[in-house]
């Protein structure tokens, strides 16, 4: 069932690159595709994917700008971003990581490496979300207990 699968947003302006990543990931994940930075931001805000695979070189809005915009938005800031790009030099890798990406994969891709990295980053993201929700629930329980204790002290 596709609704039970983790969601990946693939962002690339080249149909061939989208096809390659889709072929590698379609069996295990629910995929969405954006062919521009603006479209990627719209889809990410609505669908809240579990990870974004982002090309660095795109017209109008490049991958760095998309990543920075995702990280600046409260609803998308925690979604992990992996750059998947032909820009394989260290300077661009550093730019991508500085923009907020969790990983950087150079093209041509190795399907097993892409699958492994996507899997581990989604697991980390979901674990973080689970722990944040658990902590939030415990904070609420503590607040309730504190209010109850304070109300009891009024009667003492």
Model segments located where?
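Two-component/phosphorelay signaling modules centered on CheY-like receiver
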Residues: 3, 15-33, 46
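The feature encodes the CheY-like receiver
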Residues: 18, 59-60, 77, 89, ...
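Active-site beta3 strand of CheY-like receiver
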Residues: 47-53
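Receiver (REC) domain active-site loop signature in two-component systems and cognate sites
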Residues: 58, 96
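C-terminal output helix
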Residues: 91, 108-118, 122
């Amino acid at each position: 069932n596709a609704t039970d699968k983790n969601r990946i947003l693939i962002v690339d302006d080249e149909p061939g690159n989208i096809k390659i990543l889709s072929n590698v990931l379609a069996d295990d994940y629910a995929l969405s595709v954006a062919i521009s930075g603006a479209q990627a931001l719209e889809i990410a805000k609505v669908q809240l994917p579990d990870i974004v695979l982002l090309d660095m070189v795109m017209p109008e809005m490049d991958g760095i700008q998309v990543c920075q915009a995702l990280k600046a938005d409260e609803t998308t800031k925690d979604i992990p971003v992996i750059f998947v790009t032909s820009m394989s030099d260290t300077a661009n890798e550093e730019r991508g990581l500085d923009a907020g990406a969790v990983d950087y994969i150079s093209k041509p891709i190795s399907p097993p490496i892409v699958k492994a990295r996507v899997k581990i980053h989604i697991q980390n993201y979901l674990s973080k979300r689970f722990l944040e929700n658990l902590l939030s629930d415990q904070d609420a329980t503590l607040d309730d207990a504190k209010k109850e204790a304070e109300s009891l002290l009024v009667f003492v």
